[in-house]
């Protein structure tokens, strides 16, 4: 109430992947927001397996305009390793239900999970393109200190970033984890190529044009035309 009434805040980001875990809890919050009729623009996070079709109408009426989903991988085998138990049909069905309710979806995808191969990463890109979410984040699997992947990387003696910038997804020094089948450079190259394939897709750009307008399409086309400079990929090119 204070943010809206005293400061005129309209846009809010709820950084909690468990926000919709307890349906009774989230519906209670939505009811209070609906009563206030603040006309908010809310971005919230959710696990795919916690989104229930019965809550979508309330979420939309409460002002939630975006749900960011951790889809992670297009390979069921790799998803199982990441403890994501839904199959592809479940994922497609949930995303379509959210979009049908008038809520935009930001899909989060990871390339380079421990069991990933070039084929499974391609499956991830294929799923992302099939879903055609209003936005997509493409990440490389990273051994962030304190995470389970970091513990695994140390135990296996895998190379880790030598400086903090190496943990930054978009930095020149970015060094993701290698997989059981691919080098870190191969993972990073696939991720960067996948980003440009997705955001340059005519089907995606046409959807953006219809949904957000020509100005947003131009902005995304400009973004997709730029390539990130990567130390690992320069080393890969030199080796070839």
Protein language model regions, located:
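Active-site groove signature of glycoside hydrolases
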Residues: 4-15
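A general, composition-driven signal for non-globular sequence regions
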Residues: 7, 41, 185, 219-225
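A structural motif corresponding to the C-terminal lobe/cap of the Radical SAM core domain
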Residues: 18-23, 27-216, 239
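Short, amphipathic C-terminal "tail helix"
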Residues: 215-240
């Amino acid at each position: 109430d204070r943010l809206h009434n005293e400061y005129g805040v309209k846009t809010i980001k709820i950084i909690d992947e468990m926000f919709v875990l307890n349906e009774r809890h989230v519906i209670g919050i939505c009811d209070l927001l609906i009563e206030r009729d603040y006309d908010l623009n809310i971005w919230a996070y959710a696990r795919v397996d916690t989104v229930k079709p019965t809550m979508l109408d309330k979420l939309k009426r409460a002002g939630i305009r975006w749900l960011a989903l951790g889809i992670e991988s297009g390979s069921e085998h790799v998803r199982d390793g990441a403890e994501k138990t839904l199959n592809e049909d479940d994922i497609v069905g949930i995303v379509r239900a959210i979009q049908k309710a008038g809520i935009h979806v930001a899909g989060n995808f990871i390339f380079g999970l421990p069991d990933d191969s070039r084929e499974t990463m391609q499956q991830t890109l294929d799923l992302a393109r099939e879903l055609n979410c209003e936005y997509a984040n493409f990440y490389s699997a990273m051994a962030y200190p304190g995470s389970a992947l970091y513990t695994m990387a140390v135990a296996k003696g895998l190379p880790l970033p030598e400086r903090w910038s190496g943990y930054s997804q978009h930095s020149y020094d970015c060094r993701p984890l290698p997989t059981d089948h691919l080098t870190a450079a191969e993972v990073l190259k696939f991720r960067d190529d996948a980003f440009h394939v997705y955001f340059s897709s005519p089907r995606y750009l046409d959807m953006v044009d219809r949904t957000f307008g020509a100005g947003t399409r131009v902005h995304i086309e400009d973004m997709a035309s730029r390539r990130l400079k990567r130390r690992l990929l320069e080393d890969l090119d030199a080796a070839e």
